[in-house]
């Protein structure tokens, strides 16, 4: 049950673990359900000997990173539990946030604009890319993005919730406008991240609608046939992307569920 991240089933087996260990299991169950307040409540009074939320020091605002990284850990647990349909269904909202974070890094560094300045948040609970703000603040990039859409027989950008497809074209448009010379390391990093985002776009386009609306069972083999890598390799690529995009990212976070599982096994 620990290996499959089935913490809910362990909680139902009352008295199977000591009270402190059951509190840790309750923390993991709430955390894997993205119930942050509940997860932190169960940590009170526990002395684990390691940080449950490892993070690099002096990293500034953690709210966006914490949300994105915890969502990724849930996706990684789906992959480990071989719940590939759930993994693909969660990929779309996760990747859009990751694309926004990377666009923010590039826009701040090379264009003097933050991604927040281009987003409207009055679209219900969803964010959207503002066409007006994009044309006002980055007219050349906006024109380039529209041309890329027209080249693909798509209409120019409208006021809509963002998509992986639109953000990939936006990213290409931003990279194309970078004037200053890039180091070899910067070039490699950009190439790797663009490749990852395009890979995820293919996966999302191929399977998301069928996973959401049809009685399908996605397998690792089907995913590998689509993108040329299995989900374990894709998870590793996403981990590298998180490290590249977020200075706060401590790679120890990626193994925190294993660390907690090991703690439970040792102290059982």
Regions found by a protein language model. Give the residues of each.
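Charged alpha-helical initiation segments
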Residues: 2, 18-84
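Amphipathic, non-membrane alpha-helical rod segments
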Residues: 7-16, 230-234
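Charge-enriched, short contiguous segments at helix-coil
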Residues: 177-254
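Short, flexible helical or helix-coil boundary motifs
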Residues: 50-53, 141, 145-152, 173-185, ...
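Amphipathic alpha-helices that form helix-helix packing interfaces
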Residues: 27, 46, 68-71, 75, ...
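Conserved non-transmembrane functional hotspots
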Residues: 255-268
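Solenoid-repeat scaffolds in large eukaryotic assemblies
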Residues: 6-13, 36-42, 87-88
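Amphipathic alpha-helical interface elements
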Residues: 62-174
């Amino acid at each position: 049950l620990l290996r499959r991240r089935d913490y809910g089933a362990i909680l139902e087996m009352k008295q199977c673990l000591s009270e402190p260990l059951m509190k840790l299991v309750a923390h993991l169950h709430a955390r894997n359900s993205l119930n942050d307040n509940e997860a932190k409540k169960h940590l009170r009074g526990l002395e684990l000997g390691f940080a449950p939320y490892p993070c690099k020091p002096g990293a500034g605002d953690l709210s966006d990173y914490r949300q994105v990284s915890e969502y990724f850990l849930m996706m990684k647990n789906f992959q480990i539990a071989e719940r590939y349909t759930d993994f693909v269904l969660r990929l779309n909202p996760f990747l859009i946030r990751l694309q926004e974070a990377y666009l923010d890094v590039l826009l701040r560094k090379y264009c003097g604009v933050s991604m927040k300045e281009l987003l409207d948040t009055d679209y219900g609970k969803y964010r959207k890319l503002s066409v007006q703000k994009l044309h006002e603040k980055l007219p050349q990039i906006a024109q380039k993005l529209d041309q890329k859409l027209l080249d693909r027989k798509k209409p120019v950008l409208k006021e809509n919730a963002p998509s992986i497809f639109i953000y990939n074209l936006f990213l290409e448009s931003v990279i194309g406008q970078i004037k200053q010379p890039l180091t070899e390391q910067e070039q490699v990093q950009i190439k790797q991240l663009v490749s990852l985002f395009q890979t995820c776009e293919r996966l999302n386009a191929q399977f998301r609608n069928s996973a959401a609306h049809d009685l399908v069972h996605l397998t690792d083999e089907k995913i590998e046939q689509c993108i040329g890598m299995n989900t374990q390799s894709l998870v590793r690529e996403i981990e590298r992307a998180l490290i590249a995009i977020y200075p706060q990212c401590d790679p120890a976070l990626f193994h925190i569920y294993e660390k907690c599982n090991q703690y439970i096994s040792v102290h059982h």
